[in-house]
Amino acid sequence: MTQKTALAALLLIPSFSFAATVLSAPPELNNKSYVLMDYETGQILASKNENEKLAPASMTKMMTSYIIEQKLLSGELTEDEQVRMNESAWCRGSSSESCMYVPLNGTATALEMLRGIIIQSGNDASKAMAEHIAGNEGTFAHMMNQEAKRIGMTNTSFVNSTGMPAEGHYSTAKDMAMLAQHIIKDSSKYYPIYSEKEFTFNGIKQGNRNALL
């Protein structure tokens, strides 16, 4: 699963702050729903169907990574903490999903897993971290929903940590923009990872799934 989705063309530009009058009309994009937000003020500069509930696909991993980052910053996790790849999280190399390719029963550090999620969009890394933090993915999804509620994501429901299609798993462009704003603000130590263009693990080099880089 890639991060290309009909949910949002999500552009948050922390190094610029400009008034809404800069945009005389919303840009013409093919996306079903999008939001352009000023990071510093939270002002929505342009949008289309920003409150429409859609499947967030791999953008789900923004919340997965946000929770991991907050656990690292609070000391509940350490960067060098070893995380095991159980069979329930292990990626078998299917072409239908993106993977970090941690070997079955192998380990990676929490920081490596975070990079595997952010850069490689690894479903295996997302599920392994969910199990490591919460015991199972379902309990982790509950944590995701609690965090979404805390930061004001009122039209979001998470069922899993990866964004794989599931009934009741949805979000909106506006909610995801709000989450992105919190990642930049609350996880400033780890935010530079989002701009890293590639990551190599287990001898496998993969490029960042973010097509804007």
Annotate each language-model stretch with its function.
Residues 1-7:
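Bacterial N-terminal signal peptides that target proteins for export
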Residues 153-154, 165-213:
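Domain-terminus/edge residues, biased toward the C-terminal soluble/receptor-binding domains
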